[in-house]
């Protein structure tokens, strides 16, 4: 039986991965959270991978606190760069493939159209810079690596924009939401499904072109538009009785420690052509909004 190792299994994406793989039942799955596998601990990484000898490693472990990373630079780089290095070095010993999750924040957002995998990266913040360096290192070290860039992740688990909006709606009459940043909201369950589909192709020996791929939800919208859609669905499904007045504001109106790209829209042509994978439908995923409110 093929063996899959999931890192970061306690996080938003990791929990989605673990659930899908347990339901799948076709693989021997080792899903480890931070307490069980700290990817910044080289000895721990090598010990677990040497013992389990996974066919595929899905790395869902990451430092994702975008603003906090500006204050904790070394912590962000430790997880997003050094941790990735240790995984790659251990994987090489067993010819394990690595599927690694990255971010739209490797781009500066100045492009007018959607970003392709071949576009030059230019991150604006520490988080984006650390993820970009992790990408570079992984591609350098591991010939059997796939990097999946995604954006604006939401789902049942962890902290995300949908959960934040539903929480704020309970005690706010008015909300200001940024309208001059656009991107593709992406359901974490769909990201997990895509990673598993790719892992399965590797396991059965299909010819897979390793490298960078983009996968997000469509259509691209602003945070403001996404918030409106969330509240519309919440009211329709009686998750909320009343919703706040939502005002469109600019990035300048809502200063943050980390600078974010104005355009996070990613081109999905490559993954569609290579794997037949279609975009995530975030509007469909919002139909499950009751689960995000719990």
UniProtKB/Swiss-Prot annotation:
The keyword Signal does not apply. Pfam families: RmlD_sub_bind. NADPH binds at residues 12-13, 38-39, 62-64, 127, 131. Involved in the biosynthesis of the dTDP-L-rhamnose which is an important component of lipopolysaccharide (LPS). Catalyzes the reduction of dTDP-6-deoxy-L-lyxo-4-hexulose to yield dTDP-L-rhamnose. Belongs to the dTDP-4-dehydrorhamnose reductase family. This is dTDP-4-dehydrorhamnose reductase. GO terms for biological process: dTDP-rhamnose biosynthetic process; O antigen biosynthetic process. The keyword Phosphoprotein does not apply. The active site is at 127 (proton donor/acceptor). Binds 1 Mg(2+) ion per monomer. CDD domains: dTDP_HR_like_SDR_e. Its EC number is 1.1.1.133. It comes from the Bacteria. Pathway: Carbohydrate biosynthesis; dTDP-L-rhamnose biosynthesis; Bacterial outer membrane biogenesis; LPS O-antigen biosynthesis. DTDP-beta-L-rhamnose binds at residues 103-104, 152. NADH binds at residues 11-13, 38-39, 62-64, 127, 131. GO terms for molecular function: dTDP-4-dehydrorhamnose reductase activity; metal ion binding. Keywords: Carbohydrate metabolism, Lipopolysaccharide biosynthesis, Magnesium, Metal-binding, NAD, NADP, Oxidoreductase. The gene is rmlD. One of its GO terms (cellular component) is cytosol. It catalyses: dTDP-beta-L-rhamnose + NADP(+) = dTDP-4-dehydro-beta-L-rhamnose + NADPH + H(+). It is an enzyme of class 1 (oxidoreductase).
């Amino acid at each position: 039986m093929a063996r899959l190792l999931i890192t970061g299994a306690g996080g938003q994406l990791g929990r989605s991965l673990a659930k899908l793989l347990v339901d799948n039942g076709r693989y021997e799955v080792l899903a480890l959270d931070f307490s069980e596998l700290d990817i910044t601990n080289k000895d721990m990484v090598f010990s677990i991978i040497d013992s389990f000898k996974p066919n595929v490693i899905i790395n869902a472990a990451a430092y994702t606190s975008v603003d906090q990373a500006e204050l904790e630079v070394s912590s962000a780089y430790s997880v997003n760069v050094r941790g990735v290095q240790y995984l790659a070095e251990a994987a090489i010993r067993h010819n394990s493939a690595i599927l690694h999750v990255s971010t739209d924040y490797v781009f500066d957002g100045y492009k007018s159209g959607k970003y392709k995998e071949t576009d030059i990266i230019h991150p604006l913040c520490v988080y984006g810079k650390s993820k970009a360096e992790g990408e570079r290192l992984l591609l350098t070290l591991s010939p059997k690596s796939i990097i999946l860039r995604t954006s604006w992740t939401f789902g049942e688990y962890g902290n995300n924009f949908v959960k934040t909006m539903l929480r704020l709606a309970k005690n706010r009459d008015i909300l200001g939401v940024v309208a001059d940043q656009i991107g593709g909201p992406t359901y974490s369950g769909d990201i997990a499904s895509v990673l598993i589909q790719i892992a399965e192709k590797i396991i059965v020996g299909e010819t897979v072109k390793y490298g960078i791929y983009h996968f997000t939800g469509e259509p691209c919208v602003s945070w403001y538009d996404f918030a409106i859609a969330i509240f519309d669905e919440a009211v329709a499904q009686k998750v909320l009785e009343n919703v706040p007045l939502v005002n469109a504001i600019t990035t300048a109106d809502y200063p943050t420690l980390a600078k974010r790209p104005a355009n996070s829209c990613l081109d999905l042509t490559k993954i569609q052509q290579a794997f037949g994978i279609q975009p995530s439908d975030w509007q469909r995923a919002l139909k499950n909004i009751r689960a995000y409110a719990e």
